[in-house]
Curated annotation (Swiss-Prot):
It comes from the Eukaryota. InterPro entries: Fip1_dom, Pre-mRNA_3'-end_processing_reg. Residues 79-122 have a biased composition (Polar residues). Residues 284-321 have a biased composition (Gly residues). GO terms for biological process: mRNA processing. One of its GO terms (cellular component) is mRNA cleavage and polyadenylation specificity factor complex. This is Pre-mRNA polyadenylation factor fip1. Belongs to the FIP1 family. The gene is fip1. Residues 1-139, 283-327 are annotated as: Disordered. The keyword Nucleus applies. Pre-mRNA polyadenylation factor that directly interacts with poly(A) polymerase. It is found in: Nucleus.
Length: 327
């Protein structure tokens, strides 16, 4: 039994560590077995303790080591969710590194008017735009004075003690529009009155000229009563005017052509100037016609008589000379 145990020990442990076994029958060895067996058992226990120290199993982790990970499914899900932002960050970094094409947005409607490209066509190629509702002919009544606003007099209609726009700190825009003040408004009113009067005079002169050119003038002083309506119903002859004989349309056209040849514009002349020029031209033509008639009479009658008298005188002069010679 002891030999079998020794063999097993030899198989498990290194033979170098084994203790040599002495033969009990050897006369040179010790005679007593008990002390020897005790020593062998002590050595075996020491060897077993050394082996157990070599194969110790560590069941507790050191304090510096990280805690062990568990394989719970919930923990696995949390781990994957915590790792998702990292993957999103990596994908965003990759997207930022790779160039991307942005879609082209039409911003023509939101571009300010100052930066819009101008058209190559001129403005005259487009229709006019009517965006104002100002009435240029308006002349409203001033509520304080009861007069049209263009007829209001700052000094007469507003007493000195009732001109609130002169008070210190008063805003003039509360009383005058479009940048006017007391002085510029008075100048504007005078200018408007002069323009209206001038336009009215020109319109009246134009109407008179048109009536004159169409031979529809009322009878002038010295004209026969009823000659004007007769002239309207029957243009030729024209009603008589002071110093101007009756004219038919042909004579009227000739007179207008003569004025235009002299550099005069009949349409821009007032009626009185036109009548004076017409009277001068017609008087000259009448005088020329009378002279021509006188020359005709002189050639046909007076001239013949003079020639005849001159011949008779010549004859008489010759006869007288003859008589003188005879004398």
């Amino acid at each position: 039994m002891s030999h079998a145990m020794d063999d097993d020990d030899d198989d498990l442990y290194d033979p170098a560590d084994a203790v040599p076994v002495t033969n009990p029958s050897d006369p040179r060895g010790p005679s007593a077995d008990a002390p020897m067996n005790d020593n062998v058992e002590e050595e075996e226990e020491e060897v077993e303790e050394d082996d157990e120290d070599d194969f110790n199993i560590i069941t507790e982790a050191p304090p510096d080591a990280p805690p062990p990970e568990t394989s719970h499914p919930r923990h696995a899900n949390l781990r994957t969710e915590s790792q998702r932002p990292t993957s999103a960050d990596s994908t965003s970094a990759q997207k930022s590194q790779t160039p991307t094409l942005t879609p082209k947005v039409d911003t023509s409607a939101s571009v300010p008017a100052g930066t819009r490209p101008t058209s190559q066509k001129p403005g005259s190629a487009y229709p006019p735009v009517h965006a104002s509702n100002i009435d240029v002919n308006a002349n409203p009544v001033h509520p304080a004075t009861g007069k049209p606003i263009l007829m209001t007099d700052m000094d007469a209609d507003f007493p000195d003690d009732d001109k609130p726009w002169r008070r210190p700190g008063t805003d003039l825009t509360d009383y005058f529009n479009y940048g006017f003040d007391e002085f510029t408004w008075a100048s504007y009113v005078l200018k408007q009155q002069e323009l209206r009067k001038e336009v009215g005079d020109q319109k009246r002169q134009l109407d008179d000229m048109q009536n004159f050119l169409t031979m529809g003038l009322p009878p002038m002083p010295g004209a026969q009563p009823g000659a004007g309506p007769a002239a309207v119903s029957a243009p030729p002859p024209m009603p008589g005017m002071p110093g101007i004989p009756d004219m038919n349309p042909d004579m009227m056209q000739g007179m207008l052509a003569s004025m235009m040849s002299q550099g005069l514009d009949p349409s821009s002349m007032d009626p009185m100037s036109f009548m004076q020029h017409a009277q001068t031209m017609m008087g000259g033509q009448s005088g020329a016609g009378g002279g021509q008639q006188g020359q005709g009479g002189f050639g046909g009658q007076g001239g013949g008589q003079s020639q005849m008298g001159y011949g008779n005188a010549g004859g008489g002069y010759g006869g007288g000379r003859g008589r003188g010679r005879r004398w």
